[in-house]
Amino acid sequence: MNLMLITFNEFKTGISLNDTRAEHLVKILKLKDNDKFKFGILGEKNIYHCIYKKDKKLFFKKIFKVGESNKLKKLYVLIGMIRPIVAKRIIKELASIGTYKIIFFNTELTEKSYLNSKIFKNNDCEKHLIAGAMQGKITYLPKIKIIKNLKESLKYIQQENFEIKILLEKNSEKNLIDIEQINNAVIIVGPERGFTEKEKQLIAQYNFSPYSISTNTLRTETATIAASIITASKLINM
């Protein structure tokens, strides 16, 4: 945890010492009285130092400003529905990168029961977003959207006018690392069993271009994170 993230209400009232964030300060970082740690408030740009004091709760005070959070990058990532345990890891990593929006959708080869997982139905994903944002020292969280199928997902992002639309495709002759600097981008990644040819044709109709990041067959998790890091590195900071 490189940055403790709290809500505005937690800033006013403090958090329990049993909270995993408070426990991390003591058990992992080994903080003692009068040691400093960094915190930020969700949705606010400033990052502050705070003095740790053992008390009935962990209270926060803005001792002095030490910096500002990076903004989210104008990067959308569309992912064919995957196993919930894999989705959790992807959500955390994309939050640490500073992705703007993550969209999950069903495909022809998706296991449809995944959509009923609590991570997608009960807003369980927020804790994974926060964990990723704390790792990336970002005070902003990506938005997550669940869409019922591929076509609706493509329609949803059509109005955004992306400068580049990337379909991850192992056999493409174009390598993602070679793209120019851009202001915004969208990536679409197939589920663990990939897209059907019919789905690839539909994606092409929405002006996505195939790019490769490796000639090897990668797991969806690996491909999504690697492609997002590469693309994010090409985005011009706004």
Curated annotation (Swiss-Prot):
SUPFAM superfamilies linked to this entry: alpha/beta knot
Gene Ontology molecular-function annotations: rRNA (uridine-N3-)-methyltransferase activity
Any GO BP annotation: rRNA base methylation
InterPro entries according to UniProt: Alpha/beta_knot_MTases, RsmE, RsmE_MTase_dom, RsmE_PUA-like, tRNA_m1G_MTases_N
EC class (word): transferase
Pfam families named among the record's database cross-references: Methyltrans_RNA, PUA_4
Catalyses which reaction(s): uridine(1498) in 16S rRNA + S-adenosyl-L-methionine = N(3)-methyluridine(1498) in 16S rRNA + S-adenosyl-L-homocysteine + H(+)
Superkingdom field: Bacteria
Localization (cell): Cytoplasm
This protein's UniProt keywords: Cytoplasm, Methyltransferase, rRNA processing, S-adenosyl-L-methionine, Transferase
EC annotation from Swiss-Prot or TrEMBL: 2.1.1.193
Cellular component terms (Gene Ontology): cytoplasm
Main localisation: cytoplasm
Ranges that cross the membrane: none
Family: Belongs to the RNA methyltransferase RsmE family.
The protein's role, per its UniProt record: Specifically methylates the N3 position of the uracil ring of uridine 1498 (m3U1498) in 16S rRNA. Acts on the fully assembled 30S ribosomal subunit.
Protein name per Swiss-Prot or TrEMBL: Ribosomal RNA small subunit methyltransferase E 1
Origin species: Borreliella burgdorferi (strain ATCC 35210 / DSM 4680 / CIP 102532 / B31) (Borrelia burgdorferi)
Gene: rsmE1
